[in-house]
From Swiss-Prot:
PANTHER family noted in UniProt: 3-ISOPROPYLMALATE DEHYDRATASE SMALL SUBUNIT, 3-ISOPROPYLMALATE DEHYDRATASE SMALL SUBUNIT 2-RELATED-RELATED
Molecular function in Gene Ontology: 3-isopropylmalate dehydratase activity
Gene3D superfamilies in the record: Aconitase, domain 4 (3.20.19.10)
Amino-acid biosynthesis as UniProt keyword: yes
Lineage: Bacteria, Pseudomonadati, Pseudomonadota, Gammaproteobacteria, Pasteurellales
Name of the protein in question: 3-isopropylmalate dehydratase small subunit
Reported function: Catalyzes the isomerization between 2-isopropylmalate and 3-isopropylmalate, via the formation of 2-isopropylmaleate.
Protein's pathway: Amino-acid biosynthesis; L-leucine biosynthesis; L-leucine from 3-methyl-2-oxobutanoate: step 2/4
Gene label: leuD
GO CC list: 3-isopropylmalate dehydratase complex
Quaternary state and interactors: Heterodimer of LeuC and LeuD.
Keywords linked to the UniProt accession: Amino-acid biosynthesis, Branched-chain amino acid biosynthesis, Leucine biosynthesis, Lyase
Matching NCBIfam families: leuD, PRK01641.1
Organism the protein comes from: Pasteurella multocida (strain Pm70)
Amino acid sequence: MPKEFKQHTGIAVPLDASNVDTDAIIPKQFLQKVTRIGFGQHLFHEWRFLDDEGKQPNPDFVLNYPRYQGASILLARENFGCGSSREHAPWALDDYGIRVIIAPSFADIFYGNSLNNQMLPIRLSDEEVEELFQFVNANEGATITVDLETQRVSANNKVYSFEIDPFRRHCLLNGLDNIGLTLQHEAKIAEYESNIPAFLR
């Protein structure tokens, strides 16, 4: 079921890398599944693990640091989600527990896929993202609050405003995916179908 997104506060994990592509987010060998569940265990597989089986965590990768366990907000650098257009990338992030990604820029297809899957990608300036990186790196357990209704990010007694398409915002606030949007017009659809001549049914 789609999740309503109004306000979220969570631990932020700083992934200090630019041009993170979808193959790094979820490698191609894990794309056989046809449901959205179970991809989180393979998120950033090549970086998170030292072995192909995913049994030896890489202690030097930021998502494996004890201080960032349970993180639900991902900080990244520019052009996050570039590469192929696989929708499995936001599936993997969502299944891992990420609700928000904050970066200076995103690949267009990844940005749209994230919103379609009720995950919020937020664009802030390079300077604002750098401030958040410094805050999170310097403060263990640091949290960030995202308020979609006011379109603001709050951290370290500072507030950052972000833009989002009004229609996308409406869908997130109300937990609407494509099916949910269609069901909003269920009565009109039923009325239309009832007026279709019998020979066309």
